[in-house]
Amino acid sequence: MTLLLLSGCATQSAEKTYRQITMEEAITMMEEETGYIILDVRTAQEYSEKHIPGAINIANESIGTEDISELPDKDQLILVYCRSGNRSKQASEKLVKLGYTNIIEIGGI
């Protein structure tokens, strides 16, 4: 009986979340890793003015409750950024809720 009670306490699942790193850490990661996506969640106009080379643009406002065709692999490493860090945090939270498992928020550029 005691064993059953104790095993029930250990079944709580960890809350799904994203990681935050600095831009410097992200630069190092981009130099060392492969197979990642850089996601710019600013507006299309902001993206057209300046963006990290190789980044794809999906505006934070367009990330909702449906799967994103541009991001088919929910386990792929995705580095998320915006201008100041606010929208990248919001987008990262939404991506986690959509089931993405490897989100890293790198703030603003």
Question: Regions from the language model: what does each represent?
Answer:
Residues 1-37, 41-49:
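Flexible, polar/low-complexity N-terminal or interdomain linker segments that lie immediately upstream
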Residues 18-20, 38, 55-57, 103-105:
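Conserved beta-strand scaffold positions in the cores of enzyme catalytic domains, especially
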Residues 27, 56, 92-93:
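Residues within alpha-helical segments
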Residues 29-33, 44, 61, 81, ...:
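Structured segments of extracytoplasmic/periplasmic soluble domains
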Residues 30-31, 36, 61-80:
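Mobile, glycine- and charge-enriched loop segments
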Residues 33-34, 42, 52-53, 73-77, ...:
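Extracytoplasmic
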Residues 39-66:
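N-terminal, post-signal-peptide region of Sec/Tat-exported proteins
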Residues 68-109:
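Catalytic cysteine-centered active loop of the rhodanese-like fold, especially the PTP/DSP P-loop
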